[in-house]
A protein has these predicted regions:
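Membrane-proximal intracellular helices of multi-pass ion channels
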Residues: 1-446
Length: 446
């Protein structure tokens, strides 16, 4: 075997680079968070707590075992914010940005890895798209910070500048981390701003902007408001996203928040409709919501955002393809269709695989935590959905969990961020299927 063939055999695939890249950043972040400099008390953070926080930040989840605002120092918060930004953009995108800034030429292998990392349809134009992502991200985060600056500076003085920057990045990256907690008010999220339209609207817009995907924004910027010119995927994402905001908001409005004034009730319903799809902020007391509303939120958490975005979950396109395939079956059509375009059968198979994997992870993780911690299954399923969907919403039990249960949530967050199919492709990338096919036989379904 020649030296070239040996090198090619042991070369990492793009999917392997992605999962190892995330793991490396998480480990480095955990080590930094263990430093006494990272905490307000100047103490060393246990490794499992630092690992949990770093995983939650890189996987843009928002679940925490220590209150971010009161436990971590400004240095620790800066480490968390850096991890959120890297996780939101993607490890490969951040690495590529440094290569672009240094003037280095991006190889074809690196372009292919970048394509897989941001779910781009082709390798061509990937460098231009990466520049667009970087410029767009920092511009939108800057606008979000400036919008929230007057409110936070009014409430926190000069520290409000850091507050505005932190929450803008956290919202755009769909992370859900907040630094509003104090020793007397732990884990508040945005409950103190439930009636503040500036915070509500700004955070919601940042979440939606980060969650619809960079490719969708590229399509919008290129074709402006000419919806008919958009790619089929962009149309599906926009329609599905709008549907998943409006319908749950109407449900929440009529089922919960009776005690709020009309304006605040509308804001609360909209916010709780937007945030479960991987953002993790909340403006109301979640355990006080009805069981039906919490069930709807679990569904939204599992669905998540859109491909190539800062969000996690099984993705809006997965849901849309499965529903379109069901509609095609009822209408006795050969394939799912969107906007006069046919969906390839491989996409339907991939969507079904993703759904199966997410449901298995969600249910398996929730059952394990419920059995180990002796807690109600419904609460544990909520935390599991929040972890695997990289959301960050909690009913308050995550900080109380023992280490084995925390390790389960860490695994769910990691798998939810890198994606189950990425792990499968990374494991089988060097294997090839044979040409032989087994005999076919019918099986009864339903």
């Amino acid at each position: 075997m020649s030296e070239e063939m040996v090198c090619r055999k042991h070369r990492l695939s793009s999917f392997q680079i992605i999962i190892l890249g995330f793991a490396g950043v998480i480990l480095l972040g955990a080590l930094l968070l263990m430093l006494p400099l990272s905490t307000t008390a100047g103490c060393v953070t246990p490794f499992h707590e630092a690992l949990f926080t770093a995983t939650s930040a890189v996987c843009v989840t928002g679940l925490v075992v220590q209150d971010t605002g009161s436990y971590w120092s400004v240095f620790g918060q800066a480490v968390i914010l850096t991890l959120i930004q890297i996780g939101g953009l993607g490890v490969v995108t951040v690495a590529a940005s440094f290569a672009l800034l240094s003037g280095r030429r991006i190889s074809l292998m690196q372009r292919s890895t970048m394509q897989d990392a941001i779910s781009a349809p082709k390798v061509g134009g990937i460098v231009r798209l990466t520049r667009f992502i970087l410029r767009g991200t920092f511009l939108i985060e800057l606008i979000g910070a400036l919008a929230m600056l007057p409110v936070f500076c009014r409430d926190y003085g000069w520290h409000g500048i850091w507050m505005a920057v932190f929450h803008s990045v956290s919202a755009f990256c769909n992370a859900g981390f907040d630094i509003l907690g104090t020793n007397n008010n732990l884990y508040p999220s945005l409950t103190g701003y439930v009636q503040n339209p500036v915070i509500n609207i700004t955070v919601m817009l940042l979440i939606i902007t980060g969650g619809i995907g960079f490719l969708t924004w590229d399509d919008i910027c290129e074709n402006k408001l000419h919806f008919h010119r958009y790619r089929m995927q962009s149309k599906v994402i926009l329609v599905t996203t709008l549907t998943l905001i409006v319908l749950p908001a109407l449900f929440f409005f009529f089922v919960d928040f009776d005690a709020l004034p009309l304006g605040a009730r509308v804001q609360a319903a909209l916010f709780q409709s937007v945030t479960p799809r991987t953002a993790g902020f909340n403006t109301v007391n979640l355990p006080a919501m009805s069981g039906a509303s919490l069930g709807v939120m679990i569904l939204l958490m599992l669905i998540g955002g859109s491909p190539g975005s800062t969000a996690g979950g099984m993705k809006t396109t997965t849901l849309a393809v499965l529903l379109a395939n069901a509609a095609a079956t009822f209408r006795q059509r050969d394939s799912a269709q969107f906007f006069g375009r046919r969906v390839d059968h491989s996409a339907v198979k991939t969507a079904a695989t993703i759904l199966t994997m997410y449901l298995a992870l969600f249910f398996g993780g929730g059952v394990f935590i419920s059995v180990y911690e002796d807690l109600p299954l419904s609460s544990c399923l909520y935390e599991a959905a929040s972890a695997v969907g990289t959301v960050g919403l909690t009913l308050g039990i995550t900080p109380q969990l023992h280490i084995p249960s925390q390790m389960v949530l860490i695994a769910l967050m990691y798998l939810g961020r890198v994606g189950g199919l990425t792990l499968i492709y990374a494991a089988v990338s060097s294997k090839k299927n044979g040409n032989a096919k087994l005999p076919q036989e019918r099986i009864t379904i339903g």
